[in-house]
Amino acid sequence: MSASGDGTRVPPKSKGKTLSSFFGSLPGFSSARNLVSHTHSSTSTKDLQTATDPSGTPAPSSKVSTNSQMAGDAAGLLQPSEQTAGDKDMGSFSVTSSEDAFSGVFGIMDAAKGMVQGGLGATQSALVGTKEAVSGGVMGAVGVAKGLVKGGLDTSKNVLTNTKDTVTTGVMGAANMAKGTVQTGLDTTKSVVMGTKDTVATGLAGAVNVAKGTIQGGLDTTKSVVMGTKDTVTTGLTGAVNVAKGVVQGGLDTTKSVVMGTKDTVTTGLTGAMNVAKGTAQMGIDTSKTVLTGTKDTVCAGATGAINVAKGAAQGGLDTTKSVLIGTKDTVTTGLTGAVNVAKGAVQGGLDTTKSVVMGTKDTVTTGLTGAMNVAKGTAQMGLGTSKTVLTGTKDTVCAGLTGAINVAKGAAQGGLDTTKSVLMGTKDTVTTGLTGAVNVAKGTIQGGLDTTKSVVMGTKDTVTTGLTGAVNVAKGTIQGGLDTTKSVVMGTKDTVTTGLTGAVNVAKGAAQGGLDTTKSVVMGTKDTVTTGLTGAMNVAKGTAQMGLGTSKTVLTGTKDTVCAGLTGAINVAKGAAQGGLDTTKSVLMGTKDTVTTGLTGAVNVAKGTIQGGLDTTKSVVMGTKDTVTTGLTGAVNVAKGAVQGGLDTTKSVVMGTKDTVTTGLTGALNVAKGTAQMGIDTSKTVLIGTKDTVCAGATGAINMAKGAAQGGLDTTKSVLMGTKDTVTTGLTGAINVAKGSAQGGLDTTKSVLIGTKDTVTTGLTGALNVAKGTVQTGLDTSQRVLTGTKDNVYAGVTGAVNVAKGTIQGGLDTTKSVVMGTKDTVTTGLTGAVNVAKGAVQGGLDTTKSVVMGTKDTVTTGLTGAMNVAKGTAQMGIDTSKTVLTGTKDTVCAGLTGAINVAKGATQGGLDTTKSVLMGTKDTVTTGLTGAINVAKGAAQGGLDTTKSVLLGTKDTVTTGLTGAANVAKETVQMGLDTSKNILMDTKDSICAGATGAITVVKGAAQGGLDTSNAALTGTMDTAKGTVQTSLDTSKHMLIGMKDTVCAGVTSAMNMAKGIHKNTDTTRDTQSSVLAHSGNVATNAIHTGVHTVPSSLSGSHSIICHEPSIYRATNHGVGQAILTSTESLCCETSSFSDKYGLGHVTEPRADTKTLVSGMASSACAATRSVEECGQLAATGFAALPDELKGLGDIFQPMTTEEQAQLAVSESGPRVLSADRGSYYIRLGDLAPSFRQRAFEHALSHIQHNQFQARAALAQLQEAFQMTDMTMEAACGKLCSDQSLNTMVEAVGSHEMRASVAQDRLCTLAHQLHAAYSSLVTSLQGLPEVQQQAGQARHSLCKLYGLVSSEAGSELQTEQLAQSSAGVVEAWQGLEVLLEKLQQNPPLSWLVGPFTSMPCGQL
């Protein structure tokens, strides 16, 4: 930065010839120099601010204007400016607008006297026409010391007409009390009105706590459906084990065999636990069922209590047997267990589940979740194996398994879950979900099992069972929670939805309460069923904890959609209060074929403060939707001096004719002190012939280690061979926090869709990192390739984390999606948690591979890797997402973001690389991600995210939103990079992608962060040390009638360092892209954040928009001002700089450029610098000085308005519209002979105009380098030979200001030259050789700019700059040679233009 910590610079020694010598041979330099000399006094930086609003935030030049940013280590283009007066004393960063969606956000926070672990699991969505089944599980943990924790989840779903969806919601809360009172109630109500043919059963198994005793409990679930059954669903969960000097083993074996013609079977079981010392525990289950007319249902509910034994033995089992013989169509079973453990406190947990099924629903939903584990000097192993085989004619199979957590003190814990499903002939749907519970033993042995047997003999259609196991761990106050699952089966429903969430709370000297309210209404003709399950765990030591979950679902008529939402919220508070809420609303209206899923994990760590986090997700799908969504999350584990291993293996094979298969598995998290933790998820899916949908989701939790090692990997493989329509896989790996260790996390997602695939969606996010005296690297690589005919895919995920020490944090996320008519989209969201490790090593990897060969329609994969907290260690995280869709694919959307980093005396690096390639016929691709994080020490932080999406008529778009977390760094360096590449080859209409990463750190201050992304503009963030930080993001999307476009926007939030910030962003775009960067204040050191986006557009693209980077740099002088320089270049011809800034005139102002203007908004170089000294603007109208232009060869004139009107009504060939549809291009060979010559001259006039701009900018660069040379010589005591420079030096009064002025000028001129290059590229469509050379010229300029901007904290290096500038000159000379050849021999493939579109629909 121009203002270093000590405010001094060390002048370098001259290393030979000056830079100016490299410009001497440049042709046209002297002429261009003479040109600009006439307009020297008329240009000023205030002209550059025409695109800046009064607040100092650059307003977008057009609807799609972008603040692209060039890559570099320093926060380059932000110069001292004359923005608002309030910004002058403190560096602030203006932010550009982006109107588009954004993808993926994740956050984690770790504070003093606290620890947070949060795991977020899986997201799945199946697309058009699918008859999917979805299962999801989520697990979360919260720890609070001497505080209050509140967590609420509100999920609303509205399905209006023709919905065929199914939603189920279940939640289980656990409480642990010592010397207190515990009450747990379960209320399950089911109403079946007309013609329903369902059966509901509910069972719960209690918990057992033994001191020096033995406990055994088993869960065995067997389902046999013989003839004519349609659906079978099973869900099991195994809990966690806490052993002190003991051994714990828990196993769950679920076997399902469906022989002939069975369609769907669903079973879910849960077992709970209770631990009470010197207290009272009460558990009640109230199950009411009302069956009115013609119902053929059967309801069974059972629950077993809790047992507390001291030096004894306890055995508890749950046996549920159901036999339905003839004509039964549906059977539903639900079981929940509640565990309570309280130390000198009171805990209350209630579950209210209401279900109303009216007419014709046919679906079944199951949800399961798992608990957590705590181990001290022990070993924990967790494994999950899920195998699915569907042979012939099967339509849907869903399986989800999760493994719980284990808490061991000098012991060993092992938990395994084996789920096997075999569907032989004609089966349509099978869903299974298993989770493992938890056990707390002191010097003893515990075994817990659940046995659920269901036999449906003839003609049964549906069977649903739900069971969950809870967990309890208490050392004077521990709670680990369970899962509650609700199921509604109506009539004629075809879809299945499952949602699970777990919320854990750990409170010391507080109060804990947990309640769940689930309401479901299905009115007429709905064919869907929705299930939602959440587990809430509470750990209270002499305190109270409250957690609430509200889930409302409404399915009206004929809808065919499925919605699933899962969230995990972890809160760790020391002497504070934490609140977290989640609101999920979904509406499906008319004809829409979309599916929306949203999952978020929010982790909060507060020491002596308050935390509040809210999530609001709204989705509206109108009519005829046919989609399915699933979301799962995993929890966390805490281990001291032990080793933990957790693995999840999910294998799915669908052979012939299968339509849907969904699997969801999540593994818990581990916290180890001086131990080793390993976690892996392996998900393989193979769909051979005719399969339509396959969904798999797995996620691994988080690991917390002290002086240990943690490894986590996720491997997801999907192969779809022939005729498959949909495949969805989601995997997430947890987070890791290491002190004095190393953490590595990688995510690799590969997708290959060959022929006829319609949709592929992948989203990966990496969490956040907290490092003290270490190094953190985070990388995200997302590649998308859509070749032919792809239409739309959407994926959205957001995670938020907050780290506060003695402060307050509030975070909210609001995601709204509205799809009105005919939409065919799918949305999925998943996030992962975080981990805390001290003096250990953590490695986490996620590998997701998908191959779809022929005829596949939809494939969705989502993987996320968690966060890492390292003290004096190293953390590396990478996400690699590759997508390849070859022919016939309709839509592919991928969004990934890397999280945040918290480092004390360390270095953090984060990169995001998003590559999108759309080749032929692709219609829409949308990705949206935002990263916002807040880390506050002794302050307050608030963060909100509002994402609104509206798709009205006939839209075929997809929206994805994801956000990743933030970083906290003290006295070190943080680097974050975002690289977005987009390639659109042929016939693509619109593709927009944007990503941003950001972080906020406040020391002894208050931070408020809100994300506000609108189609027009965004507002920036302010960072203050001992101050306030605000960030807002608003994302709105409106798609009207028949629109086939996709919009993507990204915003990077701000970072405030305790002693330094350095931010740089570099973006190169040939595709419509938007990036928004927020940046903050610096104390002494630097944070580097870079965003690099490189899209490329090829021939035949309908609308490609090229944005050049906005660059910003903050200076810490008294008058230093962080400003924003924005350059935007669009594929359609833009009005000249002279028009934009009044520096001249062009012969013909072009109306088609009114809204797509290539512009630059820049503030003054410094408050003390005069306007004249700021330099000239490179863009000068080529007709402004005709006398000077005579020596430059033939000057071509553009077509007049009359000529263009004649061309518009002619019978010319196909026309390629610009992005704003205000102008168009035509292939030169397709023009009539009468128009060909003038069109050729018209195109050349634009090329010449851009050439003159580039030459002028190069000439000024030469002069600027000369001034730089003299400035450095003056610093070494030499005389300044230029009087004007002496004057400037006297005015500024310091060498630092001189160097800053020279550097600012170099950056500005590089920007102007880059803009000229970009405009040239837009005029060279259809000329790949020339475009390649132009790209090389821009690349060489970007390297030069990187050198200039990266030297912000030291002197410019003459030798390096000389070499780079020589490369710039050489590349430009090569480009001019090709342009000369183009003038002599124009190829017929050249897309000439732009020509103004005529009104009245003539085009």
From Swiss-Prot:
Start-end of each Sequence repeat: 104-136, 137-169, 170-202, 203-235, 236-268, 269-301, 302-334, 335-367, 368-400, 401-433, 434-466, 467-499, 500-532, 533-565, 566-598, 599-631, 632-664, 665-697, 698-730, 731-763, 764-796, 797-829, 830-862, 863-895, 896-928, 929-961, 962-994, 995-1027, 1028-1060
Entry comment describing in which tissues the protein is expressed: Specifically expressed in white adipose tissue and also weakly detected in heart and skeletal muscle (at protein level).
Localization per Swiss-Prot or TrEMBL: Cell membrane; Cytoplasm; Lipid droplet
Gene3D superfamilies named in the record: Flagellar protein FliS (1.20.120.340)
Domain of life of the native organism: Eukaryota
Modified residues (Phosphoserine): S25, S31, S1281
Induction: Up-regulated by PPARG and during adipocyte differentiation.
PANTHER family: PERILIPIN 4 (PTHR47538), PERILIPIN-4 (PTHR47538:SF1)
The protein's name: Perilipin-4
Organism encoding this protein: Mus musculus
Gene this protein is translated from: Plin4
